[in-house]
Amino acid sequence: MDKKQPHPLFKLATELGPLLVFFAANAKFNLFVATAAFMVAIVAAMIASYVVTRHIPLMALVTGIVVIVFGTLTLVLHDETFIKVKPTIIYSLFAGVLGGGLLFGRSFIAIMFDQVFNLTPRGWQVLTLRWALFFFGMAILNELIWRTQSTDFWVNFKVFGAVPLTMIFAMMQMPLTKRYHLEPATLEASDASEGDVRK
C-alpha cells in the first residue's frame, strides 16, 4: 500500500503538537501532569497520522514508545528523572542506530528521508554521519541541561531550544542534498543496473 503524503501543516501539528501540550501543561500545573498530557498527545498524534496516511513514521513510532515507557515510570514512581532522561535515550538510540549502520555499510537515514530526497550512496553516507553526530551531541546537551538547570528551564529548552536546533541543523543539510542529488533518470538507471547484476 502506498503511503499518503500528509499536508505539511498536518505533519507539523503531529510533530510539535504534543510538545506544545507538554509545555502548556507544565506551565499551568506541574511536570507530572504535563507528562500524562504528553503521553496522551503522543498517542493521539500517532493515531491521527495513521488515520490520515495509513502510516506512522518510524521516528515518531520509536519516540512514542519511549515516551510511553518513561512517562509511565515517571508517573508510577513519581520521579521526574525518567521523563527528563527520555530525550537522552531517544537521541542516543538514533545516534547508535545510524552510526552502527554506517559501520556495516548501511545508511538507515535513507529509510527516514527516502520520500523527500534522492541521493547518491555517498550522499546518504555523509548525511547519515552528520545526523548521527547531531543526535549524539543533543544527547549530551540534554544531559547537561536537565542535570544542571531547573525543571522549567529544561522544559523550555525541550520546546524552544531542541526543536529550533533540529530545524536549523536540517536546513543546514540542504547544500549537501543538492550536491549529492540523484536525478530520477539516473536513479532508474542505477536500479536497473543493480537488477542486471543480481541476475
From Swiss-Prot:
Alphabetical list of Pfam families matching this protein: IspA
Gene behind this protein: yciB
Record family assignment: Belongs to the YciB family.
Q: What does this protein do?
A: Plays a role in cell envelope biogenesis, maintenance of cell envelope integrity and membrane homeostasis.
Instruction: Give the membrane topology, semicolon-separated if more than one.
Output: Multi-pass membrane protein
Q: Which UniProt keywords apply?
A: Cell inner membrane, Cell membrane, Membrane, Transmembrane, Transmembrane helix
**Protein localization:** Cell inner membrane
**InterPro entries in the record, alphabetically?**
YciB
Q: What is its main location?
A: membrane
Task: Give the GO cellular component terms, alphabetically.
Answer: plasma membrane
What parts of the sequence cross the membrane? 7-27, 32-52, 56-76, 93-113, 126-146, 153-173
Q: Does the keyword Heme apply?
A: no
- Indicate yes or no for the key word ATP-binding: no
Spell out the PANTHER family in the cross-references. Answer: INNER MEMBRANE-SPANNING PROTEIN YCIB (PTHR36917:SF1), INTRACELLULAR SEPTATION PROTEIN A-RELATED (PTHR36917)
Q: What is this protein called?
A: Inner membrane-spanning protein YciB
